[in-house]
Amino acid sequence: MALVGAVVFTSCSDSETYADQKKKERSAINSYIAKNGIKVISEDEFFKDSLTDTTKNEFVLFESSGVYMQIIRKGCGEKIKDGENATVLCRFTERNLMTDSLQLSNDIISYASLVDKMNVKRNSGTFTASFDASSSVMYSVYGSTSVPSGWLVPLAYIKLGRPASENDQIAKVRIIVPHTQGQQYAVQGVYPCLYDITYERGR
């Protein structure tokens, strides 16, 4: 399987504490928000219609996880129902916000056959998921079938389907994911990632 991008390790000095690393992470997130003119809205405001206004570059901040989310397309089809198991196909780009660099992607034309497949279950409103090791760039690079918790946050608010007409579009989100909700290298390196992800229902 061909891979796109390279994993970037964020180094730190031996004397740097976890608190210091978290401050640097927060600074990187705040810098990205400021540089890109992002309007952060509260959960209360978001829950009025479960939408983010892309013309205003709105992102909702989920306080409990620290994840920022912008819904670019709500998607076609239906939301994953409680008690349902679903196959979800994802295309994504991953940027390391600490180094401001593209780290990984399966979302370019040259690699159209590459798609990350997740097995997702919703139980009492909580989502759990694992990557299919036979079809996952994330697994190939990071060596784990665990899906970053940040990837699951949008699933409660988007529709999951397959386009049945030219007017149907699959769901797409942009999320800022702190290390606590990220892939294992981000957890170890204490760095945030920016993801653009599409979600499509698998067969």
Features from the language model and the residues they span:
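Sec-dependent signal peptide recognition
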Residues: M1-A2
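Cross-family detector of peptidyl-prolyl cis-trans isomerase
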Residues: C12-R203
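C-terminal motif of bacterial Sec signal peptides marking the signal peptidase cleavage site
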Residues: V7-S11
